A protein has these predicted regions:
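Extracellular, repeat-based ectodomains that mediate carbohydrate processing or recognition
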Residues: 13-447
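Signal peptide processing junction and immediate N-terminal pro/mature segment
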Residues: 8-12
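Bacterial N-terminal signal peptides
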Residues: 1-7
Length: 447
């Protein structure tokens, strides 16, 4: 197992690679609270692309050439400003979401998460040429009504599927999708695919399906996981974990059992024990004071036999445990397994993201908040056993680690993860006012 303390020096890109396995490099000190990041790898150009939000909301980025092992811009230079987006202060919801278009252009989505008096919008930025961040990016506004938020997109064949949340009422928010068949130039009208229809008894009528989605090319489907939030106030309480699939053939929703759920999943279908859409039923827990019980970070992958494999957090103050978990679909039900577990406390150990290496070989990133540490664990038997690959301690300059997101799709070698920070004084502050560091992290291999 490899362990290394990272120094905040731009000179790291000049270090002798033969001295030790490359573990991390500082990409910039111009980041703010990243809710999440979505680094991507492009096999055509053999480059990985990294983007983050700056203090005023501007989007910055760098690309890594795996053949030359060089950064663009080099780490001795400032990162490239992809798009100017001045909001003072920035809002953590305005993080960049990234997808490679089928034609090789890099697409970056950004929401404008403002107060209702200012309105909301969802923007799309497109690289001027394939496989590169160089040049002046184009900018188009996709939607402004219904407060479009938490965008994430996935390429499926020659199409791109964009998922987002829309607001119906203050504590009634639904999940939608839109499709582009021309590399992001035009989009279908968004359609609701998950909706409680404002019928949840405790007013938990907000859908959260924030994490990155993955496409199953064999069965032509995209799995979505989500949890419920709401209560007396917006996002006050949080509970449950659900999963269903959007078919890219007929655009219907399907349960894990294969049951046809129609154009959208409603509350009765979520809670029907026969559909197995509910992966985990939980108590309602106060997300601000104790951390959401299933967090907002949960992903669904597909194993060789087509079964689903979900990774998620389960932080129960009532049960006194914080657990990093997996759930495997057996063909008739969900089998839950512990990745690791410890007593519940304020300084959380959190699951960050997942990377499918191949089939039953998967990796997860784990964040130890106040230890300033990110770890990688892996399983080669679909969650039966887990071993630690490496760990990294970061010099955060007093901030807390917030996100550790794998590059998608998997490519062996350096780098593997984009690591971001959040305010140490108030981790629920949505509008941090200081610059924070952001890094690329490896797994100790240098291929």
């Amino acid at each position: 197992m490899l362990s290394l303390v990272v120094s905040n020096s731009f000179a790291q890109d000049k270090a002798d690679a033969s001295a030790a396995p490359k573990m991390s490099e500082l990409l910039g000190n111009n980041s703010v609270y990243q809710y999440k990041t979505e680094p991507v790898y492009d096999p055509k150009s053999n480059k990985s692309f990294f983007f983050w939000m700056g203090k005023t909301g501007d989007i910055y980025g760098r690309e890594y050439n795996h053949e030359t092992k060089a950064w663009n811009p080099s780490l001795s230079q400032d990162s490239k400003k992809i798009m100017e987006f001045t909001r003072t202060p920035a809002d953590r919801h305005n993080y960049p979401s990234v997808v490679m278009a089928p034609n090789g252009h890099v697409l970056v989505l950004q929401e404008d998460h403002l107060g209702s008096k200012d309105g909301y919008a969802l923007m799309l930025y497109t690289s001027p040429k394939p496989g590169s961040i160089d040049g002046e990016w184009s900018n188009q506004t996709l939607w402004t009504e219904g407060q479009p938020s938490y965008p994430t997109a996935v390429a499926a064949g020659d199409s791109i599927y964009l998922f987002m949340r829309r607001k119906v009422e203050f504590i009634w928010r639904v999940w939608q999708f839109s499709k582009s068949d021309d590399h992001g130039k035009t989009w279908t009208e968004p359609r609701t695919i998950v909706d409680t229809e404002n019928k949840e008894p405790d007013n938990l009528n907000e859908i959260y399906s924030v994490a990155k989605k993955f496409y199953d090319p064999v069965n032509k489907r995209i799995a979505l996981t989500w949890n419920l939030a709401g209560g007396k106030d917006h996002n006050e309480l949080n509970k449950d974990l659900y999963m269903a699939c959007l078919s890219t053939t007929d655009h219907k929703m399907y349960a894990p059992t294969g049951a046809d759920l129609g154009e959208k999943v409603d509350l009765s279908e979520m809670q029907d024990p026969n559909t197995k859409v509910m992966v985990l039923g939980t108590e309602a827990q106060d997300g601000e004071k104790t951390g959401p019980i299933v967090d907002y970070t949960h992903h669904a992958n597909y194993l060789e036999d087509g079964s689903f494999f979900i990774t998620y957090n389960n932080m129960s103050k009532k049960n006194g445990k914080q657990s990093l978990m997996s759930a495997k679909w057996t063909g008739s039900d969900w089998k839950h397994s512990v990745i690791e577990e410890k007593p519940f406390q304020e300084a959380l150990t959190r699951y960050g993201s997942v990377q499918q290496v191949k089939g039953s070989h998967l990796r997860v990133s784990i964040i130890d908040d106040e230890l300033f540490k990110v770890r990688i664990k892996e399983t080669k038997d679909a969650g039966e056993t887990w071993t630690q690959v490496c760990e990294e301690v970061f010099d955060t300059k007093g901030q807390l680690l917030n996100c550790a997101d794998f590059i998608f799709p998997y490519r062996p070698g350096y780098p593997q993860i984009l690591v971001g920070t959040m305010p140490s004084k108030d981790k629920h502050d949505t509008k941090p006012k200081v610059d924070m560091p952001i890094w690329a992290m490896g797994d100790g291999s240098q291929k």
